[in-house]
A protein has these predicted regions:
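Non-heme Fe(II)-dependent double-stranded beta-helix
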Residues: 2-109
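A structural signal for well-ordered alpha-helical segments within the folded catalytic domains
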Residues: 70-74, 121, 181
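Short, structured patches in soluble enzyme cores that scaffold and shape functional sites
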Residues: 93, 113, 125-129, 141
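Short, surface-exposed loop/helix-turn segments at secondary-structure junctions
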Residues: 102-109, 157-171, 222-226
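Acidic, His- and aromatic-enriched active-site or binding-groove loops in soluble protein domains
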Residues: 104-121
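Short, conserved beta-strand element in jelly-roll/cupin
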Residues: 116-132, 179-180, 210-213
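Double-stranded beta-helix
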Residues: 132-193
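Non-heme Fe(II)/2-oxoglutarate
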Residues: 145, 149-155, 185-187, 191-232
Length: 232
């Protein structure tokens, strides 16, 4: 908590987002520009909950600079207790729609834990104002060390948790909803129990920067331009 992007950086990323296509459901064959979202939904025959940008580090100078920012690298290194390696950026919209339950599950709008590596660390930055109803990030403080134990095998299994399960396992004050104006940033070990709320008011634009000890080439957003296709 307590990180804040300069307004100029927020604006730079927002300009990038307005000028480039994003891709529904993070699929390279489902591209559209923001003004064409309704046409893209019509082409898919469903609402679009999440749309991600690809190749952001190479196409957006602000994101490239942030990926090697010395303060972020220092924080990541302190947490990882080693020299951090930048392993990927992700920039995506979450829209206030009546989403399919399968899409809410697919796009991590149910409580869950990430197991991206044996040691990893993430920074998140809101590029839009996020208040209750705008798709805030929710996490459970300290749960990276003590996951819910409700079913046989929960110590090892990675699964989705219902809101009721999380409320039964953790004190209310540990369940934190993170809100703030555009530019608000926070760092998290997403092995903790967390989720993104489904917006009900305004779309949310979020930037994630991830660091680990090694780069296995699986967390980045790079796709060959020749593989990208537009829906609308």
């Amino acid at each position: 908590m307590g990180l804040q992007l300069p307004a100029s950086v927020v604006q730079e990323v927002r300009v990038f987002a307005q000028g480039h296509p994003c891709f529904a459901d993070r699929e390279p064959g489902r591209g559209f520009r923001l003004p064409a979202r309704e046409a893209a939904q019509a082409a898919l025959g469903k609402t679009i909950l999440v749309a991600q940008y690809f190749n952001t580090e190479s196409q957006c100078e602000a994101i490239r600079r942030l990926s090697c920012d010395p303060v972020l690298m220092w924080v990541a290194g302190r947490y990882l207790e080693s020299t951090p390696t930048f392993v990927g950026a992700n920039l995506w919209w979450t829209f206030p729609v009546d989403a399919l339950e399968s899409d809410r599950d697919r796009h991590a709008h149910l409580f869950h834990r990430d197991v991206d590596d044996f040691r990893f660390f993430k920074f998140f930055f809101y590029l839009t104002d996020v208040q209750p109803g705008d798709g805030a990030h929710v996490c459970v403080a300290g749960s990276h060390q003590r996951p819910p134990m409700l079913r046989p095998g929960d110590r090892w299994n990675i699964r989705r948790y219902s809101d009721d399960e999380v409320k039964r396992c953790f004190a209310t004050e540990r369940i934190m909803e993170i809100c703030g104006p555009a530019g608000t940033g926070f760092a998290e070990n997403t092995l903790c129990v967390h989720k993104g709320r489904t917006p009900t008011r305004e779309p949310r634009l979020l930037l994630q920067l991830q660091y680990a000890l090694f780069d296995y080439g699986v967390m980045h957003d790079r796709h060959p331009v020749s593989s990208l296709r537009m829906l609308a």
